[in-house]
Amino acid sequence: MPNIRILTETDLRKVIDLDQDAIDCVQNAFVALATKDVRMPPILRLDIDDYNGEVDVKTAYVPGLDGFAIKISPGFFDNPKLGLPSVNGLMNLFSSKTGMLEAVLLDNGYLTDIRTAAAGGVAANHLARKDAKHATIYGAGVQARLQLKALTLVRNITSATIWARDLAKAEACAKKASLELGTPVSATTDGKDAAANADIIVTTTPAREPVLMADWVKP
């Protein structure tokens, strides 16, 4: 039997953070996807409509790498009402040479959170104005704070706004983000006003109806 390493979320948090290395790693993955014969099948998605949930299974193989991962990522969007996170999951790492399981990453969605935020940082680095100062985030969950942090890694963000339908949630997120980043962060439930002065806008909600209108965005 192979020696299978099991890493918990606590283990992973000790060695992986949302930093410039994470952004560079995700950018390198995008470059590989565009320039190499990457094998990436369509996402397998299972909808659990009864509980406002879905499960996504994702994988890819980059030629030349010794391993590949398969990610199982449930998203149950009523979970916050139960005091649970909306997203969790795990990843299994396999040998590219033998197909043998080498590691189980019990990250509870942490690696997905980091990867998603880092991708936002990559996008902002290539698309946002160099002099962008004010960021607006639509959403007030974990990803909202992480996206804002990612923006601060690629631009000199001096202020930010958190929008949410629930003002208390927006205020809680804004307070936590401000303490983490040392940047003034305000909260609002006015989506139009939130967009008015934004240099960068990021949406981080699972909303199925629009929360941002095109005519709100300044040129």
What is the role of each PLM region?
Residues 182-219:
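Rossmann-like adenosine-cofactor binding region
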